[in-house]
């Protein structure tokens, strides 16, 4: 049995042992009657607990089984090769080597790998390039898991030449340099540095990794959540000396295949991270509640930007965001932009009083619901709803801000959100006015958007007019609002994933004086295009494709973008063709991109 298999089996035994009762069974005779007790020691204290007669036999069997497994585990430990001297005392940072790495990586061995894992594998075992590999992205997007998977698949020979270093905020580049020299002198070849951007002097001194250690044959993998820090470094200290792998964007296809969760609604609710309750990774979803979503925005996004700017060019690169940072309002401004990212102009989001566009859209749709029109949202105290929503999201309103937010603030925050891959712009084009252009900004982590939408529903529940409705009426309104939110999010998801998956084509929304095509995919090389409507519905209705069969709209489109080779409605139902319109399941569409 190889050492790796032995270690895995030992871990399984240890888990079984932990499920069985420790200690022994003792018998006591009291007034002529025999009583049995479970005796064990915990934290240097002896404990006893009475064992009922009806469970005595099964409990004794469990005690014996634990003793047998403990003996088996003890024998296996003797089979492990003696660890080579590692001079652990010589390390000043947190370094893991040898058998500790097998234990560290054992639990992820059965996890499915992300598609980008192959790039990491190729770097470790491919031709030496004198470069470092940078694995970066927002929190909980699978970076450390990928490193552990790389360690888990190593053979024993490679593992004994590997080291994992967990960087903390107290570490320095000088201390890390000393430890790397020790590892190099002992023949270590693979070194993984996790959360390396916590080093205050990382950005200014990162050339050390490529120029000294990678150049001498060491395969170095750098990982961290401060994406901007890596981008600043790649532009200067590690220019042309690094390979970048960004983990932030997680398409529906990977969310489904890696986490094993099926359904576009689940992706809308939780998509964006590699964590979901009960599935492989963390114990609870990152976006399971408003509190978790807020914490993620503050730590994974706002802190990411602030920490990287603080460490870059000796705090001289805040540009126009310096006043916001000094007054502790940068987090608030970033949070506000993230919440209102679907607004067309970032400047308006930052300078106008906070308004819920989700609420306005839902009110319009409820009024025109053909089967059960409801105008209840017209009578809701919108000012109170807005105030409660603002409080829930902990966003400073314009009247509370002590610094003026101008175009420079808005533009710079948007630049950094783009660099983090959190936001992406989708073109909106117009016919017949071809010179009129705008953009639609989408969020790459749908779960974050949905968590904030849930806060909107909570604020609605507090409104007196809304609460006066019967339970069935309240439920109907809530479900309709969430459906509208999901519908808007589904459009963003399809547009974003199509744009990323088809770099040689142009993906955009095409608007007319009346109506629009939700998505157009234009192939410049072929001189043709495809037009789409995107619906959250599972049902088919002619109303859904009315624009696709509008002869005037189609003629204008073909004049500008060539023949229309396909007309599609992406929805949640089954594939079929109706009146020349191809209805396609949206999950299958995303799965095959």
Predicted regions and their residues:
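Structural recognition of the conserved hydrophobic beta-strand(s) that form the central parallel beta-sheet
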Residues: 194, 218-226
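Conserved P-loop NTPase "ATPase switch" module shared by AAA+ and STAND
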Residues: 184-206
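Short regulatory helix/loop adjacent to the ATP-binding pocket of P-loop NTPases
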Residues: 228-242
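Domain-level recognition of nuclease-like catalytic cores that cleave nucleotide substrates
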Residues: 565-593
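Conserved lysine of the Walker
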Residues: 143-144
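Conserved catalytic cores of phosphodiester-cleaving nucleases, focusing on short active-site segments
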Residues: 498, 517-542
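N-terminal pre-Walker A segment at the start of P-loop NTPase domains
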Residues: 84-124
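Accessory nucleic acid-recognition modules appended to NTPase machines
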Residues: 307-517
């Amino acid at each position: 049995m190889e050492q790796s298999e032995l270690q895995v089996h030992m871990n399984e035994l240890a888990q079984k042992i932990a499920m069985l009762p420790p200690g022994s069974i003792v018998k006591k005779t009291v007034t002529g009657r025999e009583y049995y007790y479970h005796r064990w020691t915990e934290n240097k204290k002896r404990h006893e607990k009475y064992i009922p007669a009806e469970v005595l036999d099964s409990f004794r069997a469990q005690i014996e089984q634990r003793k047998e497994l403990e003996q088996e585990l003890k024998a296996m430990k003797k089979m492990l090769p003696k660890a080579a001297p590692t001079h652990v005392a010589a390390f000043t940072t947190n370094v893991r080597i040898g058998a500790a790495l097998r234990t560290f990586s054992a639990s992820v061995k059965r996890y499915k790998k992300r598609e980008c894992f192959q790039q990491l594998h190729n770097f470790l075992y491919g031709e030496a390039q004198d470069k470092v590999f940078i694995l970066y992205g927002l929190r909980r997007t699978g970076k450390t898991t990928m490193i552990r998977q790389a360690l888990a698949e190593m053979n024993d020979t490679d593992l004994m030449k590997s080291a994992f270093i967990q960087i903390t905020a107290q570490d320095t580049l000088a201390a890390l340099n000393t430890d790397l020299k020790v590892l190099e002198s002992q023949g270590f070849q693979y070194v993984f540095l996790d959360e390396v951007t916590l080093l205050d002097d990382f950005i200014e001194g990162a050339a050390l990794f490529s120029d000294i250690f990678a150049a001498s044959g060491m395969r170095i993998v750098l990982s961290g959540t401060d994406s901007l820090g890596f981008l600043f470094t790649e532009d200067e200290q590690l220019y042309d000396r690094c390979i970048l792998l960004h983990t932030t964007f997680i398409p529906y296809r990977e969310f489904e295949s890696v986490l094993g969760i099926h359904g576009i609604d689940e992706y809308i609710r939780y998509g964006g991270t590699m964590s979901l309750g009960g599935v492989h990774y963390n114990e609870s979803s990152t976006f399971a509640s408003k509190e978790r979503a807020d914490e993620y925005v503050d730590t994974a996004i706002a802190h990411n930007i602030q920490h990287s700017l603080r460490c870059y060019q000796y705090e001289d690169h805040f540009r126009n965001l310096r006043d916001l940072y000094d007054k502790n309002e940068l987090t608030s401004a970033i949070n506000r932009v993230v919440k209102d990212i679907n607004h067309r102009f970032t400047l308006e989001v930052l300078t106008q009083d906070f308004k819920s566009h989700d609420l306005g859209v839902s009110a319009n749709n409820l009024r025109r619901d053909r089967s059960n029109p409801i105008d209840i949202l017209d009578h809701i105290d919108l000012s109170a709803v807005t105030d409660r929503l603002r409080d829930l999201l902990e966003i400073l309103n314009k009247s509370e801000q002590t610094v003026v937010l101008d175009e420079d603030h808005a533009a710079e925050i948007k630049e950094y959100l783009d660099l983090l891959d959190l936001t992406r712009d989708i073109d909106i084009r117009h016919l017949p006015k071809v010179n009129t252009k705008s953009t639609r900004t989408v969020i790459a982590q749908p779960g974050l958007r949905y968590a904030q939408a849930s806060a909107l529903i909570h604020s609605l529940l507090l409104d007196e007019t809304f609460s006066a409705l019967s339970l069935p009426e309240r439920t109907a309104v809530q479900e309709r609002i969430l459906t509208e939110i999901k519908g808007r999010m589904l459009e963003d998801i399809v547009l974003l994933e199509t744009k990323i998956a088809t770099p040689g084509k142009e993906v955009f929304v095409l608007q007319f004086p009346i109506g629009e095509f939700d998505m157009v995919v234009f192939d410049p090389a072929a001189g043709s295009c495809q037009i789409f409507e995107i619906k959250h519905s599972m049902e088919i209705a002619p109303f859904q494709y009315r624009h696709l069969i509008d002869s005037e709209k189609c003629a204008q489109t073909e004049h500008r973008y060539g023949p229309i080779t396909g007309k599609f409605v992406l929805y949640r139902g089954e594939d079929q063709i109706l009146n020349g319109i191809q209805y396609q399941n949206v999950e299958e569409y995303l799965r095959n991109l």
